[in-house]
Amino acid sequence: MIGDFGAANDAQRSVADRMCRYRKRHPFDHVVTTGDNIYPDGDPARFEAAFFEPYDCLLARGVEWHAALGNHDIIFDDGRSELSEPAFGMPRRNYVYRLLGLRLVVVNSNALDYEWLADATRARVEDRWTIVAFHHPVFSAGLHGSTPGFRPSLPRLFQRRGVDLVLNGHDHLYLATKKLRGIRYVVTGGGGATLYPCNPRWFVAFCIPRHHFLYVSLFADRIEVKAIPLTGPPFHAFSTRGL
């Protein structure tokens, strides 16, 4: 899981390199993004430098990507170039991906479709876990802060639907909230773009401006989330056991 990463700079390449090295001991076959995949505007002329080149060590080994659209991704052509590139794994602007008991709901928060989201988060019997990923944060203590208009409607919806984890980006930092209505909200915006400072907010459990990616593990009884820096062990970790 990464967000706010497609800057084609040294920080992005360092995070990508750490992902590739980490995968050798901690295998993963999927990468989910919280958007801002291609800075500054989603121009396909930058796909090679900002996506294919830094993540070649993952793409060449068949790692599947499931991207969300961020605000920068829609400037050039409303995101159409990213949507039409198979490597980003976006069949539509809003989509559901299901795998081995996981229901991953990926949302275009540039134009939030509440009715679609309410239906998409309605889990089936075979869905053990529901994770929702989109760009603009419900709760954030960074430069942009929490997104106006998302509260209280989205937290209430996610609680009703039994969502287990919400993953956002937009603010270039790492933030994990306290459990709010039984749900953890994470801002993972440290994939390569210039970092933003954290501000004190009542809902924050942990916040740090640091480049990173998330390693998310699914078990029968819990989800484990680890924030992985450029070097060294995870700097934050938590588990959630659902509502």
Where are these regions (language model features)?
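Structural motif
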Residues: 1, 32-34, 104-106, 131-133, ...
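N-terminal active-site segment of His-dependent metallophosphoesterases
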Residues: 1-46, 140-141
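Active-site glycine-centered loops adjacent to acidic/histidine catalytic or metal-binding residues
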Residues: 4, 35-36, 70-71, 135, ...
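Secondary-structure transition/turn motif
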Residues: 6, 109-111, 187, 226-232
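Extended active-site neighborhood of metal-dependent phosphoesterases/phosphodiesterases
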Residues: 27, 39-130, 142-165, 171-219
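Flexible loop residues that form catalytic
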Residues: 36, 137, 171, 221, ...
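A short C-terminal boundary segment appended to hydrolase-like catalytic domains
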Residues: 209-243
